[in-house]
């Protein structure tokens, strides 16, 4: 059983789509999507780096199609909002360099047995023959403290980041620029229930002529009050809005960016463990991505079934081997069934072999760019297959049967 804690604080952060690292994630996933539109069976491992006036796209891509990578890069940057040189980065004038190789033959031989990717028609033996593209461990998590079954600190942080972008793009606060960060500290009570917002930190890039006082007043009214439930705010809640006083130089001009450097923002805000693998730019044969999605799918269905208040699932793989080398379930003392029973139910109801995950979640589609900002999990704005709770009823039914016997 979990040890009782006193009242305590927990903090998570998010970033806007204009953050340098997030620009890279979106470019990598935009390239992946563009390839998958024409070649669903492509192997893609696409890394991006940005700095002042420069984008470098590198990686390993094996495909039978052609994609105009510089065009995809420029469209993505334009969509984010870097459209003028005075923003420090401009979609039309930045240099775009590419260095793309094919996937290593040594890796390919372990996963190539179904390059035609007939997951829908494959026999069990054929699925078994497709090994994982790498070794590694992945975690999935869910908790019933929010409607989307995500921890509240990361949930609110993402909503604030998204709202910063909304008010910039719709003209409500036209002086905002694309780069920004948010952070939310939540106070939990002795029962690990979130009770109030302790601290909110917002930092946003802005036009040079705007005063700090105006930014602070506008962000409190148009961002914080529009997103954070008033019931969670009290007179003790602390606000730090652009606490350095000025944030004019931002984006790739302010900091270099890299794909895969916001893995905690992408997942659970540090509330759950992380296996270390990044998501963006990787096709679904990479278990770093598909395994983490499957683990979230499993954990969310366990919580949605009422079998635990919170649940963390760990999966681990060996390169070239289809079956996970381990499956672990941790319910932190909140489980309504024993954890070993839950592991057996997971094995029964979820096909966690790489080709099985691809088939189960239909992952050969161009659905990834939309995940590259504002989190891969707990999304209510886009229909992501690993967020479905379609296995919850069957899990609950099996537990009831076991209890009856």
Swiss-Prot record:
Residues 103-113 are annotated as: Flexible loop. InterPro entries: ADOMET_SYNTHASE_CS, S-AdoMet_synt_C, S-AdoMet_synt_central, S-AdoMet_synt_N, S-AdoMet_synthetase, S-AdoMet_synthetase_sfam. Keywords: ATP-binding, Cytoplasm, Magnesium, Metal-binding, Nucleotide-binding, One-carbon metabolism, Potassium, Transferase. Pathway: Amino-acid biosynthesis; S-adenosyl-L-methionine biosynthesis; S-adenosyl-L-methionine from L-methionine: step 1/1. One of its GO terms (biological process) is one-carbon metabolic process. Mg(2+) binds at residue 21. One of its GO terms (cellular component) is cytoplasm. One of its GO terms (molecular function) is ATP binding. Binds 2 divalent ions per subunit. L-methionine binds at residues 60, 103, 255, 286. The keyword tRNA processing does not apply. Its EC number is 2.5.1.6. K(+) binds at residue 47. Its cofactor is Mg(2+); K(+). It catalyses: L-methionine + ATP + H2O = S-adenosyl-L-methionine + phosphate + diphosphate. Belongs to the AdoMet synthase family. Homotetramer; dimer of dimers. Catalyzes the formation of S-adenosylmethionine (AdoMet) from methionine and ATP. The overall synthetic reaction is composed of two sequential steps, AdoMet formation and the subsequent tripolyphosphate hydrolysis which occurs prior to release of AdoMet from the enzyme. This is S-adenosylmethionine synthase. It comes from Shouchella clausii (strain KSM-K16) (Alkalihalobacillus clausii).
């Amino acid at each position: 059983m979990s040890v009782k804690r006193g009242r305590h604080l927990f903090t998570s952060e998010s970033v806007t789509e204009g953050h340098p690292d997030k620009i890279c994630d979106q470019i990598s996933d935009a390239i992946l999507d563009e390839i998958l539109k024409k070649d669903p069976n492509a192997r893609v491992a696409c890394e991006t780096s940005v700095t002042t006036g420069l984008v470098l796209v590198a990686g390993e891509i094996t495909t039978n199609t052609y994609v105009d990578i510089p065009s995809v890069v420029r469209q993505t940057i334009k969509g984010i909002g870097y459209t003028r040189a005075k923003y420090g980065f401009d979609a039309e004038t930045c240099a775009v360099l590419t260095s793309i190789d094919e996937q290593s033959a040594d890796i390919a031989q372990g996963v190539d047995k179904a390059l035609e990717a007939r997951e829908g028609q494959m026999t069990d033996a054929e699925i078994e023959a497709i090994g994982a593209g790498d070794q590694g461990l992945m975690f999935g998590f869910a908790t019933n403290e929010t409607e989307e079954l995500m921890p509240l600190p990361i949930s609110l942080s993402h909503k604030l980041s998204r709202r910063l972008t909304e008010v910039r793009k719709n003209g409500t606060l036209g002086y905002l620029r694309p780069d920004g960060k948010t952070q939310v500290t939540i106070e939990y009570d002795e029962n690990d229930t979130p009770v109030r917002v302790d601290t909110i930190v917002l930092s946003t890039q802005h036009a040079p002529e705007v005063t700090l006082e105006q930014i602070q007043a506008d962000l409190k009214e148009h961002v914080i009050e529009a997103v954070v439930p008033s019931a969670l705010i009290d007179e003790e809640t602390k606000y730090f809005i652009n606490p350095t006083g000025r944030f004019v130089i931002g984006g790739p001009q302010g900091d270099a960016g890299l794909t895969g450097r916001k893995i905690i923002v992408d997942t659970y805000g540090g509330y759950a463990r992380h296996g270390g693998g990044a998501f963006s730019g990787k096709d679904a044969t990479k278990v770093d991505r598909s395994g983490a999605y499957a683990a979230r799918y499993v954990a969310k269905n366990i919580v949605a079934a009422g079998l635990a208040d919170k649940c963390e699932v760990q999966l681990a793989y060996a390169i070239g081997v289809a079956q996970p080398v381990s499956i672990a379930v941790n319910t932190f003392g909140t489980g309504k069934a024993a954890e070993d029973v839950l592991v057996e139910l997971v094995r029964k109801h979820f096909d966690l072999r790489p080709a099985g995950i691809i088939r189960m979640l239909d992952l050969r589609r161009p659905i990834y760019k939309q995940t590259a900002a504002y989190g891969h999990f707990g999304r209510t704005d886009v229909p992501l297959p690993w967020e479905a709770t379609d296995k919850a009823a069957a899990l609950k039914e099996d537990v009831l049967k076991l209890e009856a016997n």
